[in-house]
């Protein structure tokens, strides 16, 4: 069963995770959101019920 042979796939998986962890992830971490979350209380809107013409 060739899919159980870890020879090429284990190396590819480890190299891809190593690439992600060491190269791509540090470049993505310095990005911060432009608008940080605030502590505003949510406002509730008053809605009026809809009257259906056939009821």
Swiss-Prot record:
Regions of compositional bias (Low complexity) in chain numbering: 37-55
Pfam families: ATP-synt_8 (PF00895)
GO MF, any single term: proton transmembrane transporter activity
Primary localisation category: mitochondrion
Gene Ontology BP annotations: proton motive force-driven ATP synthesis
Coiled coil: none
GO cellular component, one term: proton-transporting ATP synthase complex
Keyword Nucleotide-binding included in the entry's annotation: no
Keyword Repeat: no
Membrane topology: Single-pass membrane protein
Transmembrane spans: 7-24
Residue ranges, annotated region (Disordered): 35-55
Entry keyword set: ATP synthesis, CF(0), Hydrogen ion transport, Ion transport, Membrane, Mitochondrion, Transmembrane, Transmembrane helix, Transport
Localization terms from the record: Mitochondrion membrane
InterPro entries, A to Z: ATP8_metazoa, ATPase_protein_8
Protein family membership: Belongs to the ATPase protein 8 family.
Function summary: Mitochondrial membrane ATP synthase (F(1)F(0) ATP synthase or Complex V) produces ATP from ADP in the presence of a proton gradient across the membrane which is generated by electron transport complexes of the respiratory chain. F-type ATPases consist of two structural domains, F(1) - containing the extramembraneous catalytic core and F(0) - containing the membrane proton channel, linked together by a central stalk and a peripheral stalk. During catalysis, ATP synthesis in the catalytic domain of F(1) is coupled via a rotary mechanism of the central stalk subunits to proton translocation.
Assembly notes: F-type ATPases have 2 components, CF(1) - the catalytic core - and CF(0) - the membrane proton channel.
Protein name listed in UniProt: ATP synthase protein 8
Organism: Corythaeola cristata
Phylogenetic placement of the source organism: Eukaryota, Metazoa, Chordata, Craniata, Vertebrata
